[in-house]
A protein has these predicted regions:
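Conserved active-site tyrosine of GNAT-family acetyltransferases
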Residues: 125, 130
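Conserved catalytic-core motifs of GNAT/GCN5-like acyltransferases
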Residues: 111-114, 131-147
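Conserved acetyl-CoA pyrophosphate-binding loop and the N-cap/start of the following alpha-helix
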Residues: 63, 89, 93-101
Length: 152
């Protein structure tokens, strides 16, 4: 790994963050959502999404390894969200690094929401001290968001 840096996302680098979000979201949701729905998640659409999150008060951070941007994460008060690492850069510790960075930025005990079918993300969060709270947002018959909280 090269020189790693985590920067706040601004208008100067939001396109890079949106590209990571779009590519990683499409990959992580390919077995969960329809192909048509996945195709909607373009860099341009995700730029709008990230901008709206920033307008709501979220701080979004971009992780670079050397001269390449590889991952993003957001923090809004005590909620960690939008943790995405490019598929080809996964399993190199970037997700854990972003998660630990975000945990330090939280205003209280860190929590997050994860799709019940996203087992890779659930394992990452469990390895890093998060546990299910039992809170659930039902999205469809087979899909729910599950709340996890850092247990200290």
């Amino acid at each position: 790994m090269g020189d790693k840096m985590i920067d706040l996302v601004t208008s100067a680098n939001i396109r890079q963050a949106a590209e990571i979000h779009a590519i990683s979201w499409r990959e992580s949701h390919r077995n969960i959502c329809t192909a048509d729905f996945i195709a909607l998640h373009t860099t341009e659409r995700q730029m709008g999404y990230l901008q709206s999150q920033m307008e709501k008060g979220a701080a979004i951070f971009l992780l670079s390894d050397g001269c390449r941007s590889v991952g993003i994460v957001s923090v809004l008060r005590d909620v960690i969200g939008d943790l995405y690492v490019l598929p080809e850069e996964q399993d190199r510790g970037f997700g854990s690094e972003l998660l630990h960075f975000a945990m330090k930025k939280c205003a209280g005990t860190p929590k997050l929401w994860v799709l019940n079918q996203n087992q890779c993300a659930i394992r990452l969060y469990e390895r890093n001290g998060f546990q299910m709270t039992g809170e659930r947002k039902v999205l469809s018959e087979t899909l729910s968001e599950l709340e996890m909280r850092l247990i200290t």
